[in-house]
């Protein structure tokens, strides 16, 4: 394959897709083949993909007080990670995070972070600037994240 040729979605052949688990989250199994860098199609592979939708997050900043606003939440995944020797945090499933929320169908990501900022931190976002839109863990999930920086007044925020 020519070094200047870029591979794209048209270089993937979906053979089968099936839902293997449907609960709070969904897991789909994809059987597919994809073009390799040498130009030929590779063998069939099977991969499970964690489907949880898409999310939006906001790093809240108060420029008048020169403060960042974070929240603390219990996370089941962090609890499960406590059994791993690779999880070297403080041993707590309560994490310090930026505000985030799941994007519902036909919902604007900016509206999600404005709503979540009020619900989770009691902050109204005055200005919002998109930092990036990216895939969170593309090796095993289709989830994408819209990350913003938002101007807030943190003078009434507790914690």
Q: What do the PLM-derived regions correspond to, one by one?
A:
Residues 1-16, 21-24:
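Alpha-helical and coiled-coil interaction segments, frequently adjacent to or embedded
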